A protein has these predicted regions:
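Short active-site neighborhood of thiol/selenol oxidoreductases, capturing the structured segment around
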Residues: 40-62
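Non-catalytic, surface beta->alpha helical segment in thiol-disulfide oxidoreductase systems
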Residues: 121-126, 130-147
């Protein structure tokens, strides 16, 4: 039974599910734990916001984050961008320090954030409009050309 559950979770996290529907109540502020272990809040009303939910133990996420970081200059013209890890603080810090350039805003997601955005696997990319509404969500790897 455990194997079936693990296989189910794996399959869900590998599928692409793109949708442009607005879901959940608008969120105007995002509070998460930064890599220093402090809780910080981000105002989500300045620009549309891209949030990438990822995990340092998941191979596809480890592939996607450097791609996201490589496209950050272009993305920041129109979006605020944050990547929220579903991993513990120490392992996330270790992976980020050894694999990224330090320009991508990284944090640790909380259960409240994951519930708010109905995160059931990763990677998950969502885009919020300036009213805090989800206007795009896609599970799975997003290739370089699509960022």
């Amino acid at each position: 039974m455990k194997k079936l559950v693990l296989i189910f979770i794996f399959l869900i996290s590998c599928t692409s599910n793109s949708s442009n529907e607005t879901i959940a109540a608008p969120v105007m502020e995002l509070t998460y734990q930064n890599l220093d272990g402090e809780f910080v809040s981000e105002d989500l009303t300045n620009k549309e916001t891209i949030i990438v939910f990822w995990a340092d133990y998941w191979g596809i996420c480890r592939q996607e984050l450097p791609v996201l970081e490589a496209n950050l200059d272009n993305l920041l013209k129109n979006y605020d961008v944050i990547a929220l890890a579903h991993s513990d603080l120490d392992s996330t810090n270790y992976w980020v320090n050894n694999n990224l350039n330090g320009i991508l805003q990284i944090g640790i997601s909380t259960n409240e954030i994951r519930d708010e955005y109905k995160v059931i696997g990763q990677p998950l990319t969502i885009i919020l409009n300036t009213d805090g509404e989800v206007i795009f969500r896609e599970y799975g790897y997003i290739p370089n050309k699509d960022f």
